[in-house]
Amino acid sequence: MAIWEQLEVSKAHVAYACVGVFSSIFSLVSLYVKEKLYIGESTVAGIFGLIVGPVCLNWFNPLKWGNSDSITLEITRIVLCLQIFAVAVELPRKYMLKHWVSVTMLLLPVMTAGWLIIGLFVWILIPGLNFSASLLISACITATDPILAQSVVSGKFAQRVPGHLRNLLSAESGCNDGMAFPFLFLSMNLILHPGNGREIVKDWICVTILYECLFGCLLGCFIGYVGRITIRFAEKKNIIDRESFLAFYVVLAFMCAGFGSILGVDDLLVSFAAGATFAWDGWFSQKTQESNVSTVIDLLLNYAYFIYFGAIIPWSQFNNGEIGTNVWRLIILSIVVIFLRRIPAVMILRPLIPDIKSWREALFVGHFGPIGVGAIFAAILARGELESTFSDEPTPLNVVPSKEESKHWQLIACIWPITCFFIVTSIIVHGSSVAIITLGRHLNTITLTKTFTTHTTNGDNGKSSWMQRLPSLDKAGRSFSLHRMDTQMTLSGDEGEAEEGGGRKGLAGGEDEEGLNNDQIGSVATSGIPARPAGGMPRRRKLSRKEKRLNRRQKLRNKGREIFSSRSKNEMYDDDELNDLGRERLQKEKEARAATFALSTAVNTQRNEEIGMGGDEEEDEYTPEKEYSDNYNNTPSFESSERSSSLRGRTYVPRNRYDGEETESEIESEDEMENESERSMASSEERRIRKMKEEEMKPGTAYLDGNRMIIENKQGEILNQVDIEDRNEARDDEVSVDSTAHSSLTTTMTNLSSSSGGRLKRILTPTSLGKIHSLVDKGKDKNKNSKYHAFKIDNLLIIENEDGDVIKRYKINPHKSDDDKSKNRPRNDSVVSRALTAVGLKSKANSGVPPPVDEEKAIEGPSRKGPGMLKKRTLTPAPPRGVQDSLDLEDEPSSEEDLGDSYNMDDSEDYDDNAYESETEFERQRRLNALGEMTAPADQDDEELPPLPVEAQTGNDGPGTAEGKKKQKSAAVKSALSKTLGLNK
């Protein structure tokens, strides 16, 4: 068949086209495949490589490119070095120092146990192999793969995995690829030197352990340290651009692969040590946390590599009885690998691994040990070492060596297909485990939702009783406001100031969350109602001598600053058309004025100290020198903070600006400026480290594992653990939805406040979905059909999406409406309450403890009327209550015993008879005088009217009737009380 001569088809060109077509198509649907189907790119790329490979279409066949062993080994080396370096860089700051115990337990005992167990089963199931050869095959699959582990480390499913487990799996997958070398070469020495124990031990300890592993770690630490120092120096001097800065770690990964291969050390361990040292202080991760250049490079390499692997899988050798790779043997071995390689060892060693908190976490860590690229690298490396004993030319992967060439021909022939079968099994099992777990949770959620809806829906408008206990957001009768709660701020030395200024710093300005700066995001927002002290008027605090002196000095400083700034501003803008020379002259004049200003302060330093030690009489004296001294000591900003900091401690000598010679004072001032800049850089580094430590102490996520709640920061470090004790066990279906989360939180560490011990309510289907949509960010989720779940903990309202992600946190602050102010509040011991009870305006039955108010009725407001609603009266408004209307978190009980009994979920308010002051003797006399029970001497200037005689009282019902007397007495009391309370003005 003739082909048009213009078409130049080659193997490399076809490979480029296949990789490009797959990458473009998969990129278009990558979000759906990863976030909805929970399938990683490695699985899909392997399937595509199988389709276009020699098994199906035969478009892409790397086995015909020539030396396939060497090509596969070098491609695998580069991919592994990049991935391992990236894993080490993305670990939290100083992670290996803080968690070396957990990582060591997973590397040494867990890997050793898996190596021995799998080697034993390979020896049993594969005929013709001795135990040493079986250990070599087992050593190839001992390490876990950092690429396949990304399915549980990053992505949507990773948000459901605790952060400390994600970090542990990442660190382990990066380390154990390099730590597989001791197991690999120990097995190799057992095969090559049988019966020669001295040679085996000497070669394994001196060459493998000390040189390849230990020296490789030191080499990696050196490369990482030098890279960190040089990139910080380049960034400090501003001689590196942004693109090179982001791609610098890729360069270091290539450097590790190159020098590690040249020196013959464990280049995978070199890459991990270099990455951990390079990102040891967290500076590089902080600088590159918003950019994803490294992720893009890794993604492209993963696409290409797994397409390549899918094309070279030896499917024809998976059922080759000549070398012992029957398919049923391989299936049994795969089941053994999945269940016995890691799970038993991790479950047994769980008490010795600090980062594994429960048996469920131990099972999860034991299961997610995927086999991938590291196994390919180890298998080809072991095959090449065995072939080097009898030939300099490596045997291709798809060729079975003859029995005459080497006595290890079966091991050379079967090590590659057995390893590839384990990799395919791991991709299928571990790649689909995430989807299966998520599907199981989804089905479980659907079943629970149907059960709750069927058994608990009743009442008006199809609402359930457990839903009615929440403050409904679609009612207008109850006035309350929702404010974002503080989930990011760390209380430091300005804690009291932040609390007092919460109303000013809150999100009350109507700004969107994206438009706020870092200081405003996460600040505490209050209801805007200032706390009213007892008596109605806050007491003015007397200032001490020191505070008066500081206030007086502050006024003088402000005055001097205004004079200086106005003078410089007027001089600056006298001429609108200044050339470059004029601008430079103005700048020098301003610097000269600043120098003179600072010079005058140095002359009067001693006098300032005498003035500061004097009394209030000495402080009343005001001189210009004192003003300058105060301004100097407090370092005012003239034009910029840099200039003001450079003026501190400098001595200036006035001279002509046209002189060409420099004085000694100017040279000294330049040296001091350099020292000042160095000190400022050191202080900025200290501030950065302090800020990073504060970020590490901020709680980010809480995970519930049985009766234990684990609180982590954003980096996955565990901050606290809380034990949850269930109090109510047996309830009916309806009550269980509302009250199964009745629990008390017992603090096992020290960083958790008692406010976290509230009881939990969950809404599965909110009543007003439109209102909930208005509470969440519109930019995050514009789909109005999505579900939201709300949790109420005391007066906190937490809104989550259907994936369990927290969208918003709000604080419910009840407000006093006009109707509420006009209503009678139950006051048992107050004068007004007793007076109204005595005249019959208030029934004695209502004078006691008020009946429980249905919260649903209270929410609906005055539109609903019933016997439980309070009457609306405008005659005698109640004085300000002694208790605060808006509920604060600080009012919660601090001990767990009080926490369990202090809050009742069925009550909307707590009424306390002792919350009001007892009646004084003077108030009692006034009350009795107003009621006519007691006669007191009265003057003409008294504001109260004397009680009317009974015989003078008249009414519509006649003077002698009981009803008339009652109304007349009521009118007199109303008049007296109105005058007393200041209503008749």
Swiss-Prot record:
Membrane topology of the entry: Multi-pass membrane protein
Compositional bias (Basic residues): 538-558
Residues spanning the membrane: 13-33, 37-57, 71-91, 106-126, 129-149, 177-197, 204-224, 245-265, 295-315, 320-340, 362-382, 411-431
Residue(s) carrying Phosphothreonine: 765
Biased composition (Acidic residues): 661-675, 887-920
One term of GO molecular function: potassium ion transmembrane transporter activity
Modified residues (Phosphoserine): 568, 768, 774
Main location: membrane
Record topology, Extracellular segments: 34-36, 92-105, 150-176, 225-244, 316-319, 383-410
Compositionally biased region (Polar residues): 517-526
Cellular compartments annotated: Cell membrane
Keywords linked to the UniProt accession: Antiport, Cell membrane, Ion transport, Membrane, Phosphoprotein, Sodium, Sodium transport, Transmembrane, Transmembrane helix, Transport
One cellular component term from this protein's GO annotations in UniProt: plasma membrane
Domain of life of the organism encoding this protein: Eukaryota
Composition-biased stretches (Basic and acidic residues): 559-572, 580-593, 676-698, 815-828, 854-863
Function: Sodium export from cell, takes up external protons in exchange for internal sodium ions. Also capable of exporting potassium ions.
Family, per entry: Belongs to the fungal Na(+)/H(+) exchanger family.
Protein name: Na(+)/H(+) antiporter
Lineage: Eukaryota, Fungi, Dikarya, Ascomycota, Saccharomycotina
